[in-house]
Regions:
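Intrinsically disordered, low-complexity linker/terminal regions across diverse proteins
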Residues: 1-137, 141-227
Length: 227
């Protein structure tokens, strides 16, 4: 899995360097951010402490206590540096995540099984499955929202104005492509269809992730003398 992540990051590095619409200063900052990505795989090395949280026999009261405990926990983070070791999900979650405020990608243990990942499967299967997911999550670091955070997770405008304008001009085409699309099961209903602007980040992640997984797989083949 670590090897897959490295191949995907390397593929993104090459793709960024090849961008024709992005200026060199922004490319360098993008490469710096990419180098600062932190990958969390399987389960946390440090488990969160729930000391002080006590439960009784009243379900409603337990829910209230849990909510209050979490509220206080989140407030306690104010004014402190972000903990890059903290996980945003449990290992039992079948999903993957990009967290812009710490610039990390997370792949819980539950998603590291077929059909997404199988250590005994052919490399093509893993690059096409979990590889596309890895690419999707890395892509969130450079989409319409994640691109507004730097490599340390700070909300920081690191793009030139011209590059941002070029990005928005290009992604407007993707917004237009998805606008109004209606799933076949909803055709004939009153649904308004997809909001291309609202789903832009996910669409960038899906399309970019799959494409970059192919690039990474080709490099894997070259590195191992395969065809």
């Amino acid at each position: 899995m670590l090897e897959l992540v490295e191949y995907l990051i390397d593929a993104y590095r090459s793709r960024i360097q090849q961008l024709e619409w992005m200026s060199e200063p922004t490319k360098q900052r993008a490469l710096e951010k990419l180098a600062q990505f932190n990958a969390k795989i399987g389960y946390p090395e440090k488990w969160r402490s729930y000391d002080g949280l006590e439960f009784g026999e009243d379900l409603v009261e337990n829910v209230r206590r849990g909510a209050a405990f979490e509220h206080d926990y989140q407030l306690s983070k104010i004014g402190k540096a972000s903990d890059r070791q903290e996980w945003v999900s449990s290992p039992q979650t079948v999903n993957a995540f990009y967290n812009p405020v710490v610039n990390d990608i997370t792949f819980p243990a539950a998603i590291l099984q077929p059909p997404f990942f199988d250590p005994d499967a052919d490399a093509a299967e893993n690059f096409g499955a979990i590889g596309a997911v890895i690419g999707h999550e890395i892509g969130h670091g450079f989409d319409d929202q994640g691109s507004r955070y730097d490599g340390l997770g700070n909300l920081n405008s690191w793009w030139t104005d011209e590059d941002r304008a070029n990005f928005e001009q290009l992604t407007a085409k993707l917004v237009g492509q998805f606008n109004g699309l209606v799933p076949s099961v909803l055709e004939g209903t009153k649904t308004k269809g997809v909001n291309g602007e609202f789903t832009l980040g996910e669409n960038i992640g899906d399309l970019g992730g799959l494409g970059i997984a192919v690039v990474a797989y080709k490099k894997y083949l070259d590195d191992n003398g395969l065809e």
